[in-house]
Amino acid sequence: MKIYKRMESFKQEAALLVPLYKGDRIPDEITELLGYDVTNDICLNYETINETLTMGKAEVKKIIFAGLGEKEKLTRSKLRKFMGKLARKEKGKICVWLDSLDEDKIFDIVYGMYYSMYSYLPKEDGILSYASDKDVEGDIRKAMSCAAAINHARHLGNTPPNHMHPEDVANDAKRMAENLGLRYEILTNKELKEMGAGALLGVNQGSAHEARLITLWYQGDGDAPYTALVGKGITFDSGGYNLKSAAGMHWMKLDMCGGANVLGAMQWLATKKVKANVMAVVAATENMIGPDAYTCDSVLTSLSGKTIEITNTDAEGRLILCDAITYAQQKGAKRIIDVATLTGAVIGALGTTYTGVFTNSDVFYQELKHAAEKTEEKIWQLPVDEDFHSQIRLSDVADMVNSVSGGKGGASLAAAFLEEFIEDGIEWIHLDIAGSADTDNGEGYRTKGATGAMVETMAALFEK
């Protein structure tokens, strides 16, 4: 989607969009252009659309007066969704009148339009122009770069699995790091075996493609401690020998959305030059069946040295995450947020719009909650305590099991498993985005597929 500065550079078929609050008068320039005042003829309730043809009086064919409703009731998400739907309706060929709007609203309008116009398959570029006497180009560029970061995460998740193997995730992360000046490290099976990352390697055994452990560093705050964003990057999940059903296997390319969204958050932070020190650790592998694939009853030794009895090969995400979490701590992270499409149980509990949150720190959770309130992403805290830890530790042959049969409290049990690998003094949050990571029906605001869940909230956590 391209952006131009003035409507003079616009095509004849484009529309001029004028967003107005309830009670606003039509800008004098628009009245002069039309030759009459239409203020009393239009309704400006939220999501009302009033169109009028210019009859050759302007370089655009029509003017759209978009009702924003009452100013105090307009939320960021409502504005983004409405503007995004309008952008898709007009196929991006739209000029936006921005003179009457403040910086935050300009950001949300451009962000919503840019987000909504994303498509995995290449299409004709939309052409977003703007009309304003104010200096808003910086605000627009900022919104574009942030939307580009979340769309990058969405694109990684939406890419077909035969084009997005672990090495492809690593190559994408490398390109991004080099473009943004980030330090990076990519480990392959040889290094992972030498360091003892047995949980990640165990999951990888059935795949024809080697695993990758990808680490990026963004240093924007001198010698301050690092926070790690740890992402699950299962590029395709067959379930292993606990094989998924046909319906359950469909869309399992999206099982890497945790890793993709972590990379998107890093792009956002680096582009905006946020004052923070953040590392991203993404464990990438397929979970497949094959002659060497791991099986139930196997015992894996994790990077931490703790042993894990495999009771379900389809509970693989927590296995690759536990090694990534340990590695982040070895690299000096003092705070950890792990992100994963981890359990179907969280969908049963919270549906498809909320992200489940688990933590060992009320202080850290309140910071995340404040960030989520700012971005208007929906989160909900769920329990993780000794009731769940005691079940995870019930193994006769290892320190713990990777899954507990019975299907009760599955999201909390998965979180408890991960917390077993959090060292003393480390603040930790687990985000289960199994429900919020994708949408299976293309809404007016966004296309079918990956949503980029929690990218913006993770970034907002570091923005002061």
What are the roles of these predicted feature ranges?
Residues M1-Y4, C43-Y46, A58-V60, H163, ...:
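A generic structural signal for tightly packed, nonpolar segments enriched in small/aliphatic residues
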Residues M1-G233:
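Short amphipathic alpha-helical segment within the helicase RecA-like ATPase core
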